[in-house]
Amino acid sequence: MECYQFSSGMSAKEQVAGMLENEQITPEMKGLIRIPQVEYFVNSGVGKRMGEAEKSGKLYREKPFVMGFSDDQLEAFGFAEHTTVLEKVSEELTLIQGIIDVFWIEKDGIVLLDYKTDRVDTEKELSERYAAQLKLYGEALNRVYENETDDQGNPLKVKERLLYSFRLGKVIPV
């Protein structure tokens, strides 16, 4: 989804063929892409919102971050010790590195979305598995945009944290 152009008007099949031709993906990667699942997502409400954000230049993909968090903050997010790769830089600070799949800015806040392909049976299972990660990523975005304002002049904050399960074909609020 990193290269997908939501506002192009092209079908997923056409876009995947173009990505292969432009060497953005390999033939092996193309073989793993399930076109109907991509089409379903792109035509969903969230996919359409992403298209609108893309048109206005406010869709951001694969954004890396490195940020320090206190142990208390990590505990509040639900991170237990050894649940992810963390680097302790001092007694008070742990350095977290991550890559945000996609986020976009709407008139009243930031929407954070993480794509998932896990084999799960329920939304709850996926939500519980990734809640801490999305809280942490949301806080990272809040810090990055702490001096920005939304269209109403309010501080720009993450307003929605979402997972999209390709397996379940669902957007899951977290």
Q: Model-flagged regions — what are they?
A:
Residues M1-V85, V89:
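A non-catalytic, helix-rich entry segment at domain boundaries
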Residues Q73-V174:
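Mg2+/Mn2+-dependent nuclease catalytic core
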